[in-house]
C-alpha cells in the first residue's frame, strides 16, 4: 500500500516509521546507491502503462486506439522495454531518444519522431528504421522528408501537428496549442473568427446518420449537406444563396470553408501531393500539460474532426488517425486534483463519437501520448539533509493557507535545481517527508532548498516537517518520476544522480550516477 495516493504503489511505512519501497528502506537504498537518488518503482510503471492502454481501448470501444509513451518524461532502455511490453509505442524527439529506444530493441514500427527542428539525420534514421510516424511540425518539412525518403527509396509515414487554438495547461511554457508558440501549424487563417467553430458544440444534438455513414448516401446528414455547401463555396465563394439549407448547415459550411483556407489544410495538401513517398496517416494535436479534465481535449478533438472532414471534402481522402496528444494530470501534493482517467476518457470518447456521426465520417484511429501520467507518481527522489537553519520572518508573513507565521526553517539537501528544475522553471509544487524515521509529532513550517548558488534553488516551497529534523536525515520527495532525470543538469558542476529501479524482484541501477571523472573527461581543454 502506498504511503499516500501520490506515492509509488510499492511504497509503504514500516513500524519504525521508515519509508520503504518493495520492502527496501530509503536509508538502505541511499547507503547502497548513494545520495541524491532517483528511485523508480518499475512495477508501478508497468501497471500504469497497462492501465492507460486498457482505459483508452475501453473508452473508445468503437475504434482502434494507440497509446505512445512520451519519452521526454523519463527514458532509459529498461523503461523503453517496460512500456512497449505494456502495449505502448514511444514518442521520441531527438537523436539521443531515438538511439536509446532502438538500443533497447524497440522496433521502428513502435516509434514516433516529433520535433519542431528535426535534423536530416534524425529524419533519415526514422525513415530507415520504419518509424510508425514522423510528425510534421512546419510547412516546409514535407518537402524535406519527401526528398530524403526518395533518396532512400522508401515511403515515410507522416502526420501533421496542428495548433487547434485551444489553450490548456497550468503554466504558459506547457500550454502548446495556442498560435503564438513554436509547435505545429495553425488550424485557422490569421484573423479568422474562431467563434464560427462553436457550431461544433451543437453537432451532438443532431440525429446521427451512424458511425459508419459514408458521404453520397441517399439521405444526407448535416455533414454531407455542409460538404456540398463547402464544395460550392470553394467554387463560388461570394454566393451562398444557391440552395436552401438550414442555418446549422450554413454555419457548419462556413466553419469548414474557414478551415479550408487555413495553413493546416494547405500543409495536408502538400503532404498528399507527395503521396508516392509520403503516406499521410493523420493529424496530431497536443494542447498542454497537467490538464485535470476532458473539456479542452473535447474542444480540440472536435476541431481535429472538422479538419478531417474538410480534407475529405476538398481532396476525397479520409485521414486514418487523430492523435490527441498527452497532458493528463497527476497530483503532486496530497489533496491536489488529478485526472480521473476512466471518467474523462469516456467523456472524450462520447464527444468524438457524436461529432463524427454528425459529420457523417467513420471513426478514426484515436491516439494518445501520456508521459507524465505514466511515470511521475512512480518516482521518488531521496536526499540527505544538511544544514537546518531557522529564519525569523516579518510580522506580516503568512503561509500558503493564509495563517500568520513568524519562523521558517530552511532545510538544505545535497541536491537541488540540478536534479529537479521544475519548481524554479514552472513554479511547480511538491511535498516531502522524513524517510529514515518517524520524527516528532510537533512540526515546523519548512522550505526545502538545494545546495546551489542560486536563491531560486527551491525543491519544496512550503511543507510542514517534524520539528526535530536534523543533519543526516533522509528526505523523500515524491512524484519526481517525470522530468526529474530528463531535465537534470550539471549546474555548479553537480553530478547527476543515479536512477535505481525497485520492484518486487530487486533493486538495481537503471542509469548510473555521474562521476567527477566524467566531468573531467568531457573537458578536453589543455
Place the predicted regions along the sequence by residue.
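A charged N-terminal "starter" segment
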Residues: 1-157, 172, 192-215, 221-250, ...
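Active-site loop/helix belt of alpha/beta enzymes
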Residues: 2-3, 165-392, 465, 492, ...
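Conserved, mostly hydrophobic/aromatic
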Residues: 45, 72, 94, 126, ...
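Active-site-proximal loop/turn and secondary-structure-junction residues that shape catalytic pockets
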Residues: 73-75, 96, 117-119, 138-140, ...
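The start of beta-strands in P-loop NTPase/AAA+ ATPase cores
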Residues: 89, 132, 156, 281, ...
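Hydrophobic residues within beta-strands of alpha/beta enzymes
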Residues: 90-91, 111, 134, 283, ...
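Solvent-exposed alpha-helices and their adjacent loops that cap or buttress functional pockets
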Residues: 103-106, 127-128, 150-153, 175, ...
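Charged (often Lys/Glu-rich) extended helix/loop segments that serve as interaction or gating elements
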Residues: 353, 357, 361-526
Amino acid at each position: 500500500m502506498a504511503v499516500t495516493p501520490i506515492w509509488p504503489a510499492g511504497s509503504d511505512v514500516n513500524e519504525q516509521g521508515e519509508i520503504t519501497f518493495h520492502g527496501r528502506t530509503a536509508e538502505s537504498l541511499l547507503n547502497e546507491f548513494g545520495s541524491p537518488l532517483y528511485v523508480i518503482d518499475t512495477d508501478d510503471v508497468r501497471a500504469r502503462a497497462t492501465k492507460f492502454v486498457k482505459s483508452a481501448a475501453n473508452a473508445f470501444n468503437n475504434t482502434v486506439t494507440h497509446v505512445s509513451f512520451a519519452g521526454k518524461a523519463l527514458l532509459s532502455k529498461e523503461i523503453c522495454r517496460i512500456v512497449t511490453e505494456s502495449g505502448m509505442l514511444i514518442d521520441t524527439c531527438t537523436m539521443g531518444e531515438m538511439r536509446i529506444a532502438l538500443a533497447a530493441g524497440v522496433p521502428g514500427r513502435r516509434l514516433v519522431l516529433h520535433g519542431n527542428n528535426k535534423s536530416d539525420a534524425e529524419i533519415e534514421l526514422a525513415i530507415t528504421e520504419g518509424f510508425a510516424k514522423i510528425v510534421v511540425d512546419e510547412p516546409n518539412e514535407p518537402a524535406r522528408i519527401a526528398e530524403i525518403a526518395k533518396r532512400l527509396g522508401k515511403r515515410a509515414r507522416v502526420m501533421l501537428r496542428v495548433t487547434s487554438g485551444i489553450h490548456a495547461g497550468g503554466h504558459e511554457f506547457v500550454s502548446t496549442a495556442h498560435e503564438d508558440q513554436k509547435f505545429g501549424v495553425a488550424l485557422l487563417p490569421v484573423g479568422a473568427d474562431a467563434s464560427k467553430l462553436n457550431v461544433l458544440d451543437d453537432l451532438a444534438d443532431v440525429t446521427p446518420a451512424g458511425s459508419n455513414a459514408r458521404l453520397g448516401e441517399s439521405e444526407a446528414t448535416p455533414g454531407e449537406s455542409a460538404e456540398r455547401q463547402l464544395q460550392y463555396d470553394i467554387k463560388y465563394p461570394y454566393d451562398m444563396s444557391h440552395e436552401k439549407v438550414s442555418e446549422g448547415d450554413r454555419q457548419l459550411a462556413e466553419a469548414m470553408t474557414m478551415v479550408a483556407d487555413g495553413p493546416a489544410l494547405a500543409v495536408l495538401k502538400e503532404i498528399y501531393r507527395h503521396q508516392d513517398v509520403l503516406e499521410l496517416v493523420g493529424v496530431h494535436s497536443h494542447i498542454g500539460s497537467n490538464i485535470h479534465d476532458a473539456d479542452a481535449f473535447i474542444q480540440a478533438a472536435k476541431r481535429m474532426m472538422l479538419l478531417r472532414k474538410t480534407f475529405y471534402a476538398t481532396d476525397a481522402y479520409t485521414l486514418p488517425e487523430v492523435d490527441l496528444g498527452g497532458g493528463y494530470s497527476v497530483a503532486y501534493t496530497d489533496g491536489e486534483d488529478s485526472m480521473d482517467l476512466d471518467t474523462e476518457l469516456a467523456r472524450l470518447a462520447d464527444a468524438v463519437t457524436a461529432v463524427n456521426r454528425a459529420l457523417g465520417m467513420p471513426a478514426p484511429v484515436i491516439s494518445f501520448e501520456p508521459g507524465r501520467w505514466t511515470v511521475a507518481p512512480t518516482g521518488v527522489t531521496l536526499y540527505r539533509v544538511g544544514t537546518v537553519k531557522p529564519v525569523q520572518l516579518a510580522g506580516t508573513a503568512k503561509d500558503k493557507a493564509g495563517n500568520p507565521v513568524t519562523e521558517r526553517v530552511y532545510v538544505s539537501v545535497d541536491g537541488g535545481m540540478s536534479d529537479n528544475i521544475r519548481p524554479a522553471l514552472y513554479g511547480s509544487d511538491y511535498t516531502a517527508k522524513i524517510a529514515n524515521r518517524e520524527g516528532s509529532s510537533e512540526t515546523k513550517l519548512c522550505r526545502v532548498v538545494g545546495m546551489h548558488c542560486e536563491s531560486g534553488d527551491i525543491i519544496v516551497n512550503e511543507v510542514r516537517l517534524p520539528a526535530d529534523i536534523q543533519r543526516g536525515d533522509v528526505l523523500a520527495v515524491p512524484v519526481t518520476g517525470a522530468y526529474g532525470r530528463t531535465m537534470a543538469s550539471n549546474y555548479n558542476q553537480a553530478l547527476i544522480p543515479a536512477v535505481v529501479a525497485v520492484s518486487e524482484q530487486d533493486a538495481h541501477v537503471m542509469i548510473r550516477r555521474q562521476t567527477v571523472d566524467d566531468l573531467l573527461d568531457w573537458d578536453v581543454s589543455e
